Amino acid sequence: MNIFTVNGAHYKSNCLPGLNDLLREAERHPIAYNRLKKEMEAIIISCIRRDLRGWKPNGLCQLNIVYGEKSKGNRRDYDNVVAAARKLINDALVKSGTLKDDNPSYLLYGKNKFMYTDEVFVRVEIEVLNDADRSD
């Protein structure tokens, strides 16, 4: 299995920013948005390199993602978390050289699982499946 995990709270008390957070930064200033996006992508790329160790899928692949959000405090909308995380993860996979591109010729959306957990276990787990390994 080819799984990489982004562990810990990297944006405020969450693992990754939500869509509202990204939009707020873009409204504030384009450079602020770009800085936040680059910081998050750098964190994700380091996790890709640490866990996948140069592995690349053969052709088309599918991403199955598990989002572990903190159970206490302000719960974020599922849609906001998924939209922003997918964007950041897809761009990081391309920038790390793991994927050639993030268009539908190379990447299919798989399953999204969303769970609430302790603050200690805030994370996003990404499973990258080759075309032959994926389940529809």
Q: For each predicted feature, which ranges?
A:
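Catalytic phosphate/metal-binding cores of nucleic-acid and nucleotide-processing enzymes, i.e., regions
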Residues: 1-136
